[in-house]
From Swiss-Prot:
Residues 395-443 are annotated as: Disordered. Belongs to the Mg-chelatase subunits D/I family. Gene3D superfamilies: Magnesium chelatase subunit I, C-Terminal domain (1.10.8.80), P-loop containing nucleotide triphosphate hydrolases (3.40.50.300), von Willebrand factor, type A domain (3.40.50.410). Keywords: ATP-binding, Chlorophyll biosynthesis, Chloroplast, Ligase, Nucleotide-binding, Photosynthesis, Plastid, Transit peptide. Residues 551-751 form the VWFA domain. This is Magnesium-chelatase subunit ChlD, chloroplastic. GO terms for molecular function: ATP binding; ATP hydrolysis activity; magnesium chelatase activity. Residues 404-413 have a biased composition (Pro residues). The keyword Ligase applies. It catalyses: protoporphyrin IX + Mg(2+) + ATP + H2O = Mg-protoporphyrin IX + ADP + phosphate + 3 H(+). PROSITE patterns: VWFA. Pathway: Porphyrin-containing compound metabolism; chlorophyll biosynthesis. One of its GO terms (biological process) is chlorophyll biosynthetic process.
């Protein structure tokens, strides 16, 4: 759905600036310069729809007030003035029409207007009518969804109607450091002390109900907070059971999430629970870039002038949203159309059923925006592009299909055959009944071809870029160990009941737990010596979280003629990783093995100076105790894990896989050197190493094997080590330190996102 309207402002802008504004409206609305209600929507439906909205004052309020500023008077860039990004603006209009659509996620690098579009959408949202005294923006027309206790507090006017008032549609942003109690709500200490009972204090979720809930950099949001947030949004209700509170309130805002994939991917599980996932990293023409810079400069110099230039487009979008919300109640989608969406999802390799559910809702919203009660072909195609395509697993089209010639045109028909065919068609049309006509109309509302072919490839190659963008930013499922929880160090994320002595007292949670009992405790204390009464049962401890770095342990074969090259490569790779690990808190350790045993040449460290000093001496030569080297790496990793500073551990083994020293000889050289001590066979040495590799997998560590064996005498045992440890394997016999560093960084990045 494009936005091709060229809008000539009715006010004069800077003489040197010629701007072309792209309308927010779909093509059926953009056939004329401005939205014409009576020409686009059926007249018999327009008047009652407007009247239905104006009864609560929303339409009148929208025309009288300008809602382009935040609560603090800050002017946000208008959405109608954003150049390009048509698909994202369409998605935002869909979300404004139906906040229950499932949320919108926008990915993009820096400077792609992600946040600008999210904030600019707030200006086109119509105001809402809420019940007076409601803490969660209760809808007077849906009393079954009111929060607990509102029935007792509600007030009535002289006519017996519930008292209401009009407010701006809420726009709530969740900060990255938000705590759980601020998000879902907690105890109101002041009111609890006054009343002597537990009083609920609403959180951000209550404030965002029926509005917009915006999360910037959702990929950096705490994992527990993001899971809690999406669970509440999926259920549509926030149930708080904590600190003596039992409270529930509705929570159905429109979720808008933005993130930069370069700063970390979003878990696939989270993206799957958001309906529309789009990328702002789309190619932009030179002319559009010039226009974007021009309008941004004009907004900085004179924002009021820009608002005036797009004022009419913004008002039209508000009216369109109000009307579309009413049409949405009557929009229907047929069973055949649902089958089409399911087939597209199956061909695209989409997992689960969320894609079809979201796509059906998006198609209905598109029809409502067009002022229709039925879903058409274009609605289905657009729904597939917005919802199913970003979730798809694209397969490459076979070469023989890519260069296939187009099918030959049908043979020409003579005039007599045409006349006979026309007569037969007329007879068939007369014999068709009403049911046949409905079936024919239904068939016309299905696309003639699928977006995905039977093999899962894209029929339209123009859509390949969008699918690739979606797959590039897609994260992996799983629970990350990039955060360490403790009770003594880190950032305070939530209170908890102490398990033993309290190391860090959560003063806020302790006061909240004690607040409801202050009145009773004062009455018991006749001497009245204290102002606040806190008992041991009120104590709450802080749960802290801190960023956990990864530990990379280089296990280097320092035996043989190529030992010096391996050690130099490991040294260079370690120094490169340390130079880049300041923000990620990664540590590096080097364990060379030679002679009869392995030694920790560089203990886990983030210091480049220490690494340079320790690595000045590079011991080489002797036997190859590979099993002892891997065992030492496991011991170092476990000790580092106990320190509480390491979340992920990766062992990088640079070896040819040839071992000639047993683990018994490495642990007890004197006993192994005795004349009567049996010498281990080659198979026994391999079994030892395989056993250690299995232990690496069981401890949760990751193994990367860089095979340096000559391919002419290769035994393939290094690859077997990686297979048993469920690790990665690279054959790099002549790799430099840069190549080793690159391979390690890629494996480490995959480990952190897993």
């Amino acid at each position: 759905m494009g936005f091709s309207l060229t809008h000539t402002p009715h006010t004069t802008a800077s003489p040197n600036l010629q701007l072309r504004f792209h309308s927010l409206l779909p093509p059926s609305f953009t056939s004329q310069p401005f939205l014409s209600l009576h020409s686009t929507f059926p007249p018999k439906r327009t008047v009652p729809k407007l009247r239905a909205q104006s009864e609560n004052g929303a339409v009148l309020q929208a025309s009288e007030e300008k809602l382009d500023a935040s609560n603090y008077g800050r002017q946000y860039f208008p959405l109608a003035a954003v150049i390009g990004q048509d698909a994202i603006k369409t998605a935002l209009l869909l979300g404004a029409t139906d906040p229950r659509i499932g949320g919108i996620a926008i990915s993009g690098r820096r400077g792609t207007a992600k946040t600008i579009m999210a904030r600019g959408m707030h200006a086109i949202l119509p105001p809402i009518e809420v019940v007076q005294g409601s803490i969660a923006n209760a809808d007077p027309s849906c009393p079954e969804e009111w929060e607990d206790g509102l029935y007792k507090r509600v007030e009535y006017d002289s006519d017996g109607n519930v008292k209401t008032h009009i407010i701006k549609s809420p726009f709530v942003q969740i900060p990255l450091g938000v705590t759980e109690d601020r998000l879902i709500g907690s105890v109101d200490v002041e009111e609890s002390v006054k009343t002597g009972t537990t009083v609920f204090q609403p959180g951000l979720l209550a404030e965002a109900h029926r509005g917009v809930l915006y999360v910037d950099e959702i990929n950096l949001l705490d994992e527990g907070i993001s899971n809690l947030l999406l669970n509440v949004l999926t259920e549509g209700v926030n149930i708080v059971e904590r600190e003596g509170i039992s409270f529930r309130h509705p929570c159905r805002p429109l979720l808008i999430a933005t993130y930069n994939p370069d700063e970390g991917s979003v878990r696939e599980h989270l993206l799957d629970r958001i309906a529309i996932n789009l990328s702002a990293d789309l190619p932009m023409s030179f002319e559009n870039r010039v226009e974007a810079v021009g309008i941004a400069t004009e907004f900085q110099d004179n924002c009021g002038q820009v608002f005036k230039m797009v004022d009419e487009d913004t008002d039209n979008a508000k009216t369109q949203i109000i009307l579309a919300r009413e049409y949405l109640k009557d929009v229907t989608i047929s069973k055949e159309q649902l089958k089409y969406l399911v087939i597209e999802a199956l061909r695209g390799g989409v997992q689960g059923h969320r894609a079809e559910l979201y796509a059906a809702r998006v198609a209905k919203c598109l029809a409502a925006l067009e002022g229709r009660e039925k879903v058409y072909v274009d609605d289905l195609k657009k729904a597939v592009e917005l919802v199913i395509l970003p979730r798809s697993i694209i397969t490459d089209t076979p070469p023989e299909q890519q260069n296939q010639p187009p099918p030959p045109p049908p043979p020409p028909q003579n005039q007599e055959s045409n006349e006979e065919q026309n007569e037969e068609e007329e007879q068939e049309e007369e014999e068709e009944d009403d049911n046949d006509e409905e079936n024919e109309q239904q068939q016309d509302q299905l696309p003639e071809e699928f977006i995905f072919d039977a093999e899962g490839g894209l029929v339209d190659e123009k859509l390949l870029f969008f699918a690739q963008q979606a797959q590039r930013r897609r994260g992996k499922a799983g629970r990350a160990k990039n955060v360490i929880f403790s009770e003594d160090r880190g950032r305070y994320i939530k209170p908890m009941l102490p398990k033993g002595p309290v190391k860090r007292l959560a003063v806020d949670a302790t006061l909240r737990a004690a607040a409801p009992y202050q009145k009773l405790r004062r009455e018991k204390d006749t001497e009245n010596r204290r102002k606040v009464y806190v008992e041991k049962t009120d104590m709450r401890a802080k749960r802290m979280a801190r960023k956990a770095g990864a530990l990379v342990i280089f296990v280097v074969d320092a035996s043989g003629s190529m030992a010096l090259n391996r050690m130099q490569n490991a040294k260079g790779a370690a120094l490169k990783l340390l130079a880049e690990s300041y923000t990620s808190r990664d540590q590096v350790s080097i364990i060379p093995f030679r002679g009869d045993s392995a030694e920790v040449l560089l203990p886990p460290s983030r210091s480049i100076a220490m690494a340079r000093k320790r690595l000045e001496r590079l011991p080489c030569g002797g036997g190859s105790p590979l099993a002892h080297g891997l065992t030492t790496a496991v011991r170092v990793g476990l000790n580092a894990e106990k320190s509480g500073d390491v979340g992920r551990i990766m062992i990088v083994a640079i070896t040819d896989g040839r071992a000639n020293i047993s683990l018994k000889r490495s642990n007890d050289p004197e006993a192994a050197a005795a004349s009567d001590a049996p010498k281990p066979t080659s198979q026994e040495l391999k079994d030892e190493i395989i056993e250690v590799a299995a232990k690496i997998y069981k401890t949760g560590m990751s193994l990367l094997v860089i095979d340096t064996e000559n391919k002419f005498v290769s035994t393939g045992f290094a690859k077997e080590i990686a297979r048993v440890a469920q690790g990665k394997y690279y054959y790099l016999p002549n790799a430099s330190d840069a190549v080793v560093s690159l391979a390690t960084r890629e494996a480490l990045a995959a480990l952190k996102s897993s």
